[in-house]
């Protein structure tokens, strides 16, 4: 109604001027309204980047350069402070690690030195294992130097090659150069056999335990037991390693325990049972061992004896035997041959097995027995060449002069100069499958060989 009345009024000059004034005023107010809203919009846009700063992770991923500059600008003082502390802690850590490595290396070298310098004058306390870690070194032979195997560093090898003593070392055939057969472990063979040489010095029975400990069991009884066990191993087609380990277990148990003669055969079948479980894929049952004794012993007696033997050994069964070293020494002996000689292998195995019966061979280390068997086997088969060569000397670490006593004792066994009636091993190696090497004899050993 107001607007209609205003329009219907007469249009005069005063009314026209009033209308123009009102339009100017409204336009000014509208512009002021627009100007008052624009700063608010600008403030909103200005605060937009501040809200994006909350998404710090995305900012670091999408704009690495800018964020790096910002971080360097803000944290320069903290970085300088932290850097000093970090260097101090790193140097302390390096010093501690170096000291620990040095201590460990010194302890290891000390253990090896003790093992290599231990002599054979050891005392035995009956029924104890205090001498289990002691070694017998009748031969006063030194421990072989730690080998620089194929895994050794280039610096170590170059140092050895560059030494002045290298030209004086005779050449030998590398028997570990064949990497095709994984069973030979050519990459680790030098280190493995070095550890075996260290292990043979430990847990060795003293060569006079029969006289010192056993009053009811004699050397001849021990020989009869071993001869019978050879027949048992042939009956059940057991591996030769089982037989060697059996004899070792018997000697080590007799070394620390008094045994009556009625229990000697029980000890023998129990040790063969334990060795079979360790070496064989399928070991004979306890009932079978009871059967071969004509049921002289029951199953419970065998189990009780097994418990005693394992407790005496602290369940540490394995030890390197002459058979362990014989395999490697035979490879070294036939390294220069185009085709290996089976006669030499069978004859060396035969001679080594003969030592199991003779109690007096306990004074020789297993590696010495194996090396002597190879020496005598080569001399028996061929007298035109010297049985020892640089390759054998390198891999056995024994010179021919070191083996003189053991080779002569082994030849007496081969020729049976003492007239030993035990013939199980001789009958075994007279078979055609062993090339009848038991019938072979060796000529007299010359002093020039040693």
Swiss-Prot record:
CDD domains: CYCLIN_AtCycA-like_rpt2, CYCLIN_AtCycA_like_rpt1. Keywords: Cell cycle, Cell division, Cyclin, Nucleus. It is found in: Nucleus. SUPFAM superfamilies: Cyclin-like. Induction: Repressed by MYB88 and MYB124 in newly formed guard cells. Residues 18-53, 75-94 are annotated as: Disordered. SMART domains: CYCLIN, Cyclin_C. Residues 23-34 have a biased composition (Polar residues). One of its GO terms (cellular component) is nucleus. InterPro entries: Cyclin, Cyclin-like_dom, Cyclin-like_sf, Cyclin_A/B-like, Cyclin_C-dom, Cyclin_N. Its main location: nucleus. GO terms for molecular function: cyclin-dependent protein serine/threonine kinase regulator activity. It holds the Pfam family Cyclin_N. One of its GO terms (biological process) is lateral root formation. It comes from the Eukaryota. PANTHER family: CYCLINS (PTHR10177). Negatively regulates endocycles and acts as a regulator of ploidy levels in endoreduplication. Promotes divisions in the guard cells (GCs) after the guard mother cells (GMC) symmetric division. Interacts with CDKA-1. Interacts with SAMBA. Belongs to the cyclin family. Cyclin AB subfamily. This is Cyclin-A2-3. It comes from Arabidopsis thaliana (Mouse-ear cress). The gene is CYCA2-3.
């Amino acid at each position: 109604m107001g607007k209609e009345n205003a329009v219907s009024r007469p249009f005069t000059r005063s009314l026209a001027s009033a209308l123009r004034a009102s339009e100017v005023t409204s336009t000014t107010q509208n512009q002021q309204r627009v100007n008052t809203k624009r700063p608010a919009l600008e403030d909103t846009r200005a605060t937009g980047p501040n809200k994006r700063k909350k998404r710090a992770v995305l900012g670091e991923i999408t704009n690495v350069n800018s964020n790096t500059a910002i971080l360097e600008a803000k944290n320069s003082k903290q970085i300088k402070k932290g850097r000093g502390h970090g260097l101090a802690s790193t140097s302390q850590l390096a010093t501690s690690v170096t000291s620990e490595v040095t201590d460990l290396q010194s302890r290891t070298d000390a253990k090896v030195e003790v093992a290599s310098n231990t002599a054979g004058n050891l005392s035995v306390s009956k029924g104890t294992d205090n001498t289990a870690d002691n070694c017998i070194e009748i031969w006063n032979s030194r421990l072989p130097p730690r080998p620089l195997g194929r895994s050794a560093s280039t610096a170590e090898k170059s140092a050895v090659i560059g030494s002045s003593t290298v030209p004086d070392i005779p050449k030998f055939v590398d028997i570990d150069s064949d990497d095709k057969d994984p069973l030979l472990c050519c990459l680790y063979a030098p280190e493995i056999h070095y550890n075996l040489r260290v292990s043979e010095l430990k847990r060795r029975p003293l060569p006079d335990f029969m006289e010192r400990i056993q009053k009811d069991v004699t050397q001849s009884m021990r020989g009869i037991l071993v001869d019978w066990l050879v027949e048992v191993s042939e009956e059940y087609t057991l591996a030769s390693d089982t037989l060697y380990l059996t004899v070792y277990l018997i000697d080590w148990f007799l070394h620390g325990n008094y045994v009556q003669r009625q229990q000697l055969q029980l000890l023998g079948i129990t040790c063969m049972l334990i060795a079979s479980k360790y070496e064989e894929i399928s070991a004979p049952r306890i009932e079978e061992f009871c059967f071969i004794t004509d049921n002289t012993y029951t199953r419970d007696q065998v189990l009780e004896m097994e418990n005693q033997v394992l407790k005496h050994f602290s369940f540490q069964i394995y030890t390197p035997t002459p058979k362990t070293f014989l395999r490697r020494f035979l490879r070294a002996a036939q390294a220069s041959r185009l085709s290996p000689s089976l006669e030499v292998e069978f004859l060396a195995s035969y001679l080594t097995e003969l030592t199991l019966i003779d109690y007096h061979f306990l004074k020789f280390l297993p590696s010495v027995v194996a090396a002597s068997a190879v020496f005598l086997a080569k001399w028996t088969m061929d007298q035109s060449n010297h049985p020892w060569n640089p390759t054998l000397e390198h891999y056995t670490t024994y010179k021919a002069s070191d083996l003189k006593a053991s080779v002569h004792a082994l030849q007496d066994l081969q020729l049976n100069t003492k007239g030993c009636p035990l013939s199980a091993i001789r009958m075994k190696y007279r078979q055609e499958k062993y090339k009848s090497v038991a019938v072979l004899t060796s000529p007299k050993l010359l002093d020039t060989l040693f």
